[in-house]
Design a protein with these regions (language model features):
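Short nucleic-acid-contacting surface segments enriched for D/E, G, S/T with interspersed K/R
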Residues: 223-226, 262-289
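C-terminal edge strands of extracellular/lumenal beta-sandwich accessory domains
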Residues: 310-314
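Electropositive polyanion-binding surfaces
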Residues: 1-259, 284, 290, 295, ...
C-alpha cells in the first residue's frame, strides 16, 4: 500500500486529508463530545487498495471494444484546476507564508503537497486545507474517459461501494453485461445518469455539511459565556468570521458589537482597522473570543472579542437572562 501511494505521488497526485469532525451522542441524540477523526495506517491501507481496484476496473472498461469505438463505460473524472482560481488561492496562502508553484502540473502538485504537509498541527491547518480543496475542480461522473487529476490516474472509476453509490452500481451492471458478451450500453442514457448522479452528489455533500454544522452549533450552545482560542477565517464589511480552533466551528463577531473602537473594513488587505487605535485584525490572525449566543435552527454562532469590558457586560446580561428563564420555568411548573 505504501509503495502504491509513493508511486501515485511521484506521478503528481495531491494529498487532501481534511480534518473530519465527528460527534459522540447521548441517549437523546444530543452531542456530548466533539472530536477530530484520526486516520490510521489501517484506513490508508484499505484506501490504497480501493483506489487500485477502481483504477483497474476503469482500465478494463476502457479496453472494451475497438480503439475508434469503445464500449460505453462510467468514469470518475477530475479535471485540472483553473489557473485563475490557483492564483487567487496563492494570494490567500501568501497571508500565511505559503506559495504554490505554476511551472507545470507536477510543480503545482508538489508545492500543494509541501504546503499541506507544512500545515500539519498548525492553527490555520483546517482553514487553508478547506480553501485548497475549494480551489480544485469538482470531480464528476461521465462516459467520456478522462484522467483523474487529483489521483494522477489515467483511468479511474467508482466500483468498490455499490451499496451506497449509484455510479458504482452502474459500473457493476456494465461489467456484468460485458462479461456476458453483451453489446455496448446506450451511451446517452448512461451519460444522463452520470449527470444526475453528479448533481445528487453535490446535494448530498451540502446536506452532510449542514448536518455537521447543526451538531456543531448544538454542541457549542452548551458553552455560552466561555472563552476559546480562534483564528480569523473571513473578513467582511459587517464583521469577522472566527473558527474556534478546538472545535473547528465558525462563528461571527459583528462590527456593531465591537465596543472598543469603530472599525473600518479594508477589502485590499482583508482586514478591519480601528479608527482611533489603528488596531488591525486580519485574515489568519489568532484571537480569543467569547461565545455569546448559538442559534441551532439558523446554524449560527455569535462571538465577541475578549476584553474585560465585554466579559463584564456579557456576564451581567447572561445572569439576568438565566434568572428570567428560571422564573419563567417556575411559573410553568406551578401551572
Amino acid at each position: 500500500a505504501k509503495q502504491l501511494k509513493e508511486k501515485r505521488f511521484k506521478k503528481g497526485a495531491i494529498s487532501f486529508e481534511t480534518q473530519e469532525v465527528k460527534f459522540k451522542l447521548d441517549e437523546n441524540f444530543k452531542p456530548k463530545e466533539l472530536f477530530i477523526k484520526i486516520r490510521k495506517d489501517a484506513h490508508k491501507l484499505i484506501e490504497e487498495f480501493m483506489l487500485l481496484a477502481n483504477r483497474k476496473v476503469a482500465e478494463y472498461g476502457n479496453s472494451l471494444g475497438k480503439a475508434e469505438k469503445r464500449k460505453t463505460f462510467v468514469y470518475r473524472i477530475h479535471e485540472e484546476p483553473n489557473e485563475d482560481k490557483l492564483r487567487l488561492f496563492n494570494l490567500f496562502a501568501a497571508r500565511f507564508g505559503y506559495k504554490i508553484e505554476f511551472q507545470s502540473q507536477k510543480a503545482i502538485a508538489h508545492s500543494f503537497n509541501a504546503l499541506l504537509d507544512s500545515l500539519e498541527g498548525k492553527p490555520e491547518q483546517n482553514l487553508v486545507q478547506s480553501q485548497a480543496i475549494r480551489t480544485m475542480s469538482k470531480a464528476y461522473y461521465g462516459t467520456k474517459k478522462s484522467m483523474h487529476y487529483g489521483l494522477a490516474f489515467e483511468h479511474y472509476t467508482h466500483f468498490t461501494s455499490p451499496i451506497r453509490r449509484y455510479p458504482d452500481l452502474m459500473v457493476h451492471r456494465l461489467l456484468f453485461n460485458y462479461l456476458n458478451q453483451g453489446i455496448s450500453a446506450n451511451e446517452a442514457h448512461y451519460e444522463e445518469m452520470c449527470k444526475q448522479s453528479s448533481a445528487m452528489e453535490v446535494k448530498a455533500a451540502d446536506a452532510e455539511r449542514a448536518s455537521v454544522r447543526y451538531k456543531q452549533v448544538e454542541y457549542i450552545s452548551g458553552f455560552i459565556g466561555e472563552e476559546f482560542e480562534g483564528i480569523v477565517s473571513g473578513v467582511t464589511e459587517w464583521g469577522i468570521y472566527v473558527e474556534i480552533s478546538q472545535y473547528k466551528a465558525e462563528g461571527m463577531v459583528r462590527l456593531t458589537n465591537m465596543q472598543d473602537d469603530y472599525y473600518d473594513y479594508d477589502e485590499t488587505s482583508q482586514s478591519i482597522i480601528g479608527r482611533k487605535s489603528r488596531k488591525r485584525i486580519q485574515l489568519g490572525d489568532g484571537i480569543k473570543v467569547l461565545v455569546t449566543a448559538a442559534d441551532i435552527f439558523k446554524r449560527t454562532i455569535d462571538l465577541a472579542l475578549v476584553d474585560d469590558g465585554v466579559k463584564r457586560e456579557f456576564k451581567k446580561g447572561w445572569e439576568q437572562e438565566k434568572k428570567r428563564r428560571e422564573k419563567k420555568s417556575g411559573r410553568k411548573r406551578r401551572r
